[in-house]
Amino acid sequence: SVSPVTLETVPASDRPFLDHPGPLPFAHRGGAVDQPENTMPAFEAAVGLGYRYLETDAHVTADGVCLAFHDDRLDRVTDRQGVIAELPWSTVREARVDGVEPIPLLEDLLGAFPDARVNIDTKADGSVDAVAEVLRRTGAVDRVCIGSFSDARIARMRDLAGPDLCTSLGPKGVARLRGGSFG
């Protein structure tokens, strides 16, 4: 059986991403309250409110440009349509979230907020290599945590980014954790 865990019993982490004592407040999709989700103004507003932890998702265009964007399609929140993975950056860069804000590059998000921690959900298999490359170029491995609903994507990110990368549990890890609590 698993014993109850309290904040006092959780050991300090050797992961810089987890250097915050207590619960971690995240600005999901940039904390989009007054600004369009996953846009630079949304992230700026969240940081301005004191959030140290941001959350975004990663998708990649047909020509390999890595975006900080939730959906795999432009349709829901932009003034354009189409599957991001099937469109070149030259087309996607014209899309405006809520008709106003451009979709940010993941690299620009990481560069704009060097003191922020960023939880990145790799939403598609094709995003993994591009995210790893962005982390390498920006030197941001120590201030991100990679999440995914795919164990294979998490494993690939660990292989590409190295042992210093913080990752969440994948579905199998969550199942093992939950199963262990019923012993």
Where are these regions (language model features)?
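Phosphate-group recognition and catalysis centered on beta-loop-alpha active-site segments
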Residues: V2-G183
